[in-house]
Amino acid sequence: MKIDILTLFPEMFAPLEHSIVGKAKEKGLLDIHYHNFRDYAEKARHVDDEPYGGGQGMLLRAQPIFDTIEQIEAKKPRIILLDPAGKPFTQAYAEELALEEELIFICGHYEGYDERIKTLVTDEISLGDFVLTGGELAAMTIVDATVRLIPQVLGKESSHQDDSFSSGLLEYPQYTRPYDYRGMTVPDVLMSGHHERIRLWRLEESLRKTYLRRPDLLERYDFSEEERKLLDKIKEALGQGED
């Protein structure tokens, strides 16, 4: 995969080199470049200007963004604008982006964008209903979530398949040594060696956690008959079963 990031602050992305992104680069699975679009600004290196019609703040000018993207060698890239008004980013979105060969991210850092920039864009993405100072943190988050899904980046293919949200449910609780820590012990079922019992326990715990913390995920979840019965059992235990 090839990723190009347009930003006024390339140095902000240094931590990515020490994460899964760095490992992907070492394996030759990722080629990533950072472009300071101030270098392409024609008007005394100014990348922002006042909005026509008046208003608060400054807008990112179209010219530096157009010129930067036009010098990037890419065939059919997905061009992503980080914007609070964009489509919410999800695990499913990350899985979709991981199938692409080329991604370009545009990180803003002002009140907004000249609307004409959006004629270049294929995706407008938001991390949630809040506003960040710039798009860099959002871009780093999306890049990390996407790159780890590229085949062979993680040690085992199942590593990300068991993550929260990959299955549509939150991940079940996990434990490691010691068995007893300050009186808190590992559930006996995990010590049993009985694979089917462990599978059922993990599924039930995933359903329980999702029901209690993110019930909205269950509204669009495609339940198997087994999962539906387990959820009914959970609701009954909580005194919330159907009449």
Swiss-Prot record:
Span of the signal peptide: none
EC number annotated for this UniProt entry: 2.1.1.228
Localization in the cell: Cytoplasm
Gene Ontology cellular-component terms listed: cytosol
Binding of S-adenosyl-L-methionine, residues: 108, 127-132
Enzyme class: transferase
InterPro entries the UniProt entry points to: Alpha/beta_knot_MTases (IPR029028), tRNA_m1G_MeTrfase_C_sf (IPR023148), tRNA_m1G_MeTrfase_TrmD (IPR002649), tRNA_m1G_MTases_N (IPR029026), tRNA_MeTrfase_TRMD/TRM10 (IPR016009)
Domain of life: Bacteria
GO terms assigned for molecular function: tRNA (guanine(37)-N1)-methyltransferase activity
Cystines in this chain: none
GO biological process, one term: tRNA N1-guanine methylation
Key words, A-Z: Cytoplasm, Methyltransferase, S-adenosyl-L-methionine, Transferase, tRNA processing
Reaction(s) this enzyme catalyzes, per UniProt: guanosine(37) in tRNA + S-adenosyl-L-methionine = N(1)-methylguanosine(37) in tRNA + S-adenosyl-L-homocysteine + H(+)
Subunit details: Homodimer.
Purpose of the protein: Specifically methylates guanosine-37 in various tRNAs.
Family: Belongs to the RNA methyltransferase TrmD family.
HAMAP family assigned to the protein according to its UniProt record, in alphabetical order: TrmD (MF_00605)
Protein name: tRNA (guanine-N(1)-)-methyltransferase
Species annotation: Streptococcus pyogenes serotype M5 (strain Manfredo)
